[in-house]
Amino acid sequence: MPTLIALDASLSMLRPVPGRNEHTYQSLATKGIQHLLDNLTAAGKLEHVALLSYSTTAELKVDFTRDYDQVRQAVKKVEPVDKACLMSMLKAVVSIMSPWGNQNILQVVVFTDCGLGFGNTSITGFLEAYAEKESEPEFGFLKTLANYNLNFICLGLHGDYYFTRGLAVYQQLLDKVSLKGQLFMTKPAKSSDAVEGNPNPNPNPSHKSELGRTTVFELIERLCEASYKSSEVTLKCGSYFRMEASVLLWPPTAPYEQKSHIFGREPTIRHTDQKIEVCGFLSLSDIGSPATLSRHWVLPKVEREKSGSSRRSGNLSAAAKPPKLNLDTSNPNYELEKLEADIKEFYAKDSKDTEESGDDDVTIVLKPGPQTEQQKENLCVLLHGALKMENMAALVRVGDKWYGFIYAFTDSKKKSNLMLNILPPGTNVIPWLGDLESLGFPEDLAPGETASFPVRADRRSYSQSSVVWIRQASLQSDVQKVLRHAKKMPDKTQHFYKELNRIRRAALALGFVELLEALAMLLEKECAHLSLNGASNDCTLQLQHAATELRKTSNRDMKSMIVPLQKVGASDAGSTAATAPAPAYMY
């Protein structure tokens, strides 16, 4: 989920905040960006962040990176230039975000004082032009921009007329252009004359409590709560009661708008379930690369340890005995719990935890202290290790007739994590797998029956060079290569048929059957030309054979091959050339 931070670099950002002479709008925006980066750092440093400053033109200060310190340093160096132009910034956002595609959740966070701009480049001027020319190509970038989440951190006072007017125009922009966005603004301060029973109303109320560093931090907290909060779900694997744990999905799952097949019916909004259940396991090679709606990190939920305990109690905890596990005999899982407790107790007896006493045959066992949250067994760790070792993926159910798969993903830094790919709703969303609800086990096959899945290819896609005929010169080059090999037969017979079959398969794959007839005519003309120039008999026979085979309907199959003409018999070794019979050929 990449995030682009846009900072307003207009001259109006240099104004001091009324009631807070130590702060300007730009300094508050800088502190807000720093606080946003701190929140992203606490979330696990999973976000790619870029920094953009805009005025009349937009300038990319820092490209997408996970090095937040680089962004922090660049924010301090942004200097205001001239007037603000929001539309130039939005066009630059579309260009910068284009490499990420539309499958990712793209966030744009804009820090501004809600200036409208001047002249034709103002927001009001844009709305007037857009109302009359919505279908013009110059407004085509708005269709792409509608896929982004626009978050405006509005810095201003509700007592300022220009700020409140700017808020209304910004909201009008989001509504008319149908953009997904939200305005984050401070709450208006209560004036003293609004309080009932106040005998001394203050005509000049202070803005001290309305806009400041604390209120900007509150805006950032609201933004993170709305857009950067992980989805907490329960991951269940099998019927064993211990194989269930709470996990976090990052980025959070978004509602899916499923269109209705009935004309005129409203689309259905679907949400993923709070419990994700593992249905089975498949090889990664069988799944391949199907189309997915979204991808999410699967992170274990770790409770932070409380720091209130003293140092002495922390030292004594290592030597203290762990609380004895009291098992309830009436529990239906009593036998499984007892077996698990015995196994843990057996493997906990390490040689390092034993100590020999002075008496013979006496051993004192030192019990380890209670485990921390990071040392406890976790379902994510177990599932990640198993999937990575076996090179498999877990098929999971995320909703009613809605599936996805979890696998171990390794990034460019060779760090491996669990990744959840959510498929489109339905049971037949991976064509080569068929109905996901009809999958079974390999053991269900009858004796002697072989699995028809997966369908094996005759050749690997990389076994032979690919054929590209986008331009006319490429096709001419391939045909001329065949004719060059034809002139050098019988020395180049194998090369001739190899190139001929390559062109034939490419033509059949593209439905270019006319090329086979044209190639047969070229081979016949080349045969007549070579026979006049005294070419060998083998060369002319091979060319006639190739032209005949190209016209056969039986060779219109992709799996068939045109092979060279083979000799049936040959002359005796001792006979002379005059008495030797002519060699025969077999089709």
Swiss-Prot record:
Domain VWFA: 3-113
An individual GO BP term: snRNA 3'-end processing
Domain of life according to the entry: Eukaryota
Cell compartment(s), UniProt: Nucleus
Predominant subcellular localization, coarse grouping: nucleus
InterPro entries: INTS14 (IPR039841), IntS14_b-barrel (IPR045814), IntS14_C (IPR046471), VWF_A (IPR002035), vWFA_dom_sf (IPR036465)
GO cellular-component term (any): nucleus
Key words, A-Z: Nucleus
Region named Disordered: 190-211, 304-331
Family statement drawn from the similarity comment of this UniProt entry: Belongs to the Integrator subunit 14 family.
PANTHER family membership: INTEGRATOR COMPLEX SUBUNIT 14, PTHR13532
Functional note: Component of the integrator complex, a multiprotein complex that terminates RNA polymerase II (Pol II) transcription in the promoter-proximal region of genes. The integrator complex provides a quality checkpoint during transcription elongation by driving premature transcription termination of transcripts that are unfavorably configured for transcriptional elongation: the complex terminates transcription by (1) catalyzing dephosphorylation of the C-terminal domain (CTD) of Pol II subunit Polr2A/Rbp1 and Spt5, and (2) degrading the exiting nascent RNA transcript via endonuclease activity.
Subunit structure: Belongs to the multiprotein complex Integrator, at least composed of IntS1, IntS2, IntS3, IntS4, omd/IntS5, IntS6, defl/IntS7, IntS8, IntS9, IntS10, IntS11, IntS12, asun/IntS13, IntS14 and IntS15. The core complex associates with protein phosphatase 2A subunits mts/PP2A and Pp2A-29B, to form the Integrator-PP2A (INTAC) complex.
Name of the protein: Integrator complex subunit 14
Organism: Drosophila melanogaster (Fruit fly)
